[in-house]
């Protein structure tokens, strides 16, 4: 299942990224510079030429939206940025937040890691990037799309969201934000000494900054759409249900990530805080002492602790998340904003198993070890061990073919982690505001020779299509069919940002998700279908909980005897 990038594609990718990092798209001259005023000072951006177009884009990079979260502000809510005098340079990519970029090795992106190693890393990382069409000015009132990057809440940076082409082609403003990651972003003691969710609070601060300042860049603060993939989608979904984010945005796009993703939300902070306390060597008997000890650690020491976490959950902190996301959704305690919610066909194909360290388990799966693997899997899902048999019956059937078992296991994990949570959130939200649901089905041509033939769309495969062939600031080569798919997807996303509805003349019609359960299959030939994974949804939301209830009842009766 390990994914190796084809050399020709990788070379093009790395060369493209290198060009961006040394920033040579446009000539830095007085004529191409641009100055905008924010509430804390002036910033000079740059007019760049967007490749493959005749258009220009103004880029403003590394604008601070909060104070550096260091010293006493480590494990504390973000504070407003300090004003500056003179004109701040906004032509260099900001330092990324502290993170373990060695994770890129684990997903087969070693060469990319080498390039990214040249980008500075710092705790002082609460910055955002802005991309605007060259003609945009105060009063343009263009729709705004705020990109929240993914990366399991432990890795990523604003520069992953290269909004150049999207801004120019669709005449809107794109903002890409950074937020604290890993332990620095989500450590919690579960009490007033460190409530947690610092990364989410950073995102709220960035959205407030957008409300205050985006008009100076040609954006409309009353037409803000937040969007993201994976943990970015989870972030977007969490803002929909958080009282702290109310009024800061008007539309939400969640790509393969919602607030119910099991690995990114936890009722309790205990597991993470115990691990952090143990690894840090802070022999603290209480929360206050532990937080004081952790604040005294160097960035390098924090990075060592971070390496243990392949992902890190947000917590129910009583403030950003007053209750568990499922409770907030079920009690209709959320902002009724229009949403696009979607998943990919093969969410657990390639990238996620490598991150989670399960690729080898899948590769070695056979009828002989299936029962043991499913028992372990059930335990990881926090299900009773007896549920392993139910999972086998639902997904594996009676087949002995190892390849079929591996495919079915991957489908099961993709459903549990991504598809079922997305459908649940869509069903909760649709009675209060329009929800447009999609399944991205296209197998990217540039992975044709490196993935199994049955695989269509892996986790995050849609991202380059949304940004017009750009991903992580790199350019991928599309076929003509893929260029059309990308243009359509950019148009759907931009229409939604403009009007809260993705449809317009010349696009295949995308129906709203109502009781007909219609959704759009996003491929080179888009099509409308009904009731995505209806049987699997029934299994996870009705059959399995009922069985668990029966098991608990039987155990209770047995205990009473």
Swiss-Prot record:
Q: Kindly list the GO molecular function terms attached to this UniProt entry.
A: acylcarnitine hydrolase activity; all-trans-retinyl-palmitate hydrolase, all-trans-retinol forming activity; carboxylic ester hydrolase activity; retinyl-palmitate esterase activity
* GO CC field: endoplasmic reticulum; intracellular membrane-bounded organelle
| Disulfide bridge map | 97-125, 282-293
Swiss-Prot/TrEMBL catalytic activity: all-trans-retinyl hexadecanoate + H2O = all-trans-retinol + hexadecanoate + H(+); an O-acyl-(R)-carnitine + H2O = (R)-carnitine + a fatty acid + H(+)
- Signal peptide coordinates: 1-26
Gene Ontology biological-process entries:
retinoid metabolic process
Record localization: Microsome; Endoplasmic reticulum
Instruction: Please give the Pfam families that the UniProt record associates with this protein.
Output: COesterase
Q: What is its EC number?
A: 3.1.1.28, 3.1.1.-
Tissue expression summary: Expressed in liver, stomach and kidney.
> What InterPro entries does the entry give?
AB_hydrolase_fold, CarbesteraseB, Carboxylesterase_B_AS, Carboxylesterase_B_CS, Type-B_Carboxylest/Lipase
Entry annotation: catalytic residues: 230, 347, 459
Give a short account of what the protein does: Hydrolase with high activity towards palmitoylcarnitine. Is also active with p-nitrophenylacetate and alpha-naphthylacetate. May also hydrolyze retinyl esters.
Q: Which family does it belong to?
A: Belongs to the type-B carboxylesterase/lipase family.
Please state what the protein is called: Acylcarnitine hydrolase
Organism for this UniProt entry: Rattus norvegicus
